Amino acid sequence: MKVKTIMLLFQILAISTIKSADVPNRYIQENVAVRGKATQSTLPSGAGAVLSLPGFAIDGNRDSDFSHGSCSHTTNSPNPWWRVDLLQLYTITSVTITNRGDCCGERISGARILIGNSLENNGINNPACSVIGSMETGETRTFHCPQPMIGRYVTVYLPKTEVLQLCEVEVNALLPVN
């Protein structure tokens, strides 16, 4: 156990000095969100609830049409958030988000992508990887962290009263090549 812990610390130190665009040869980037469990601040009620589940944002499907059942969707509420528990620590370099494509693309403006190990305040107190200034309706964009970040929880937090809708969230982590 001590050897594994020491090796993990050396790996963390080695990759903490690289920028997200510079992936060392002994590592690959992989979307680890599909392995996780998603939750969100609220769920719509009624017929729309079945199309709004938080897990739809990590199903590996970038379909941006809400009616196709591959997007998460909160209610219109103050400070909505969506979070994926990656179930273990990862070194995260970037997060790729697909915005809703059939309407309302402007709703995501100002959202913050937060990464860390704390669930305090629903993960909103974790450090920021990036802020979404604006996105086109249906756009898929990768947001690079200024440096690799180690964390278990990735939260998308919208600091205003609005609906938060995410059609895909991909968490790009460095994994050692075996």
Swiss-Prot record:
The keyword Amino-acid biosynthesis is assigned to this record: no
Tissue: Parenchymal hepatocytes.
GO BP terms in the entry: regulation of cellular defense response; regulation of complement activation, lectin pathway; regulation of innate immune response
Pfam families (alphabetical): F5_F8_type_C_2 (PF22633)
Domain of life where this protein originates: Eukaryota
Binding site for Ca(2+): 59, 61, 70, 167-168
Phylogenetic classification of the source organism: Eukaryota, Metazoa, Chordata, Craniata, Vertebrata
Database matches in PANTHER family: FTP DOMAIN-CONTAINING PROTEIN (PTHR45713), SI:CH211-215K15.4 (PTHR45713:SF8)
Cellular component GO terms held in the UniProt record: extracellular space
Disulfide bond positions: 71-167, 103-104, 129-145
Binding sites annotated in the UniProt record for alpha-L-fucose: 73, 100, 107
Primary subcellular site in the record, as a coarse category: secreted
SMART domains: FTP (SM00607)
Protein's UniProt name: Fucolectin-1
Keywords: Calcium, Disulfide bond, Lectin, Metal-binding, Secreted, Signal
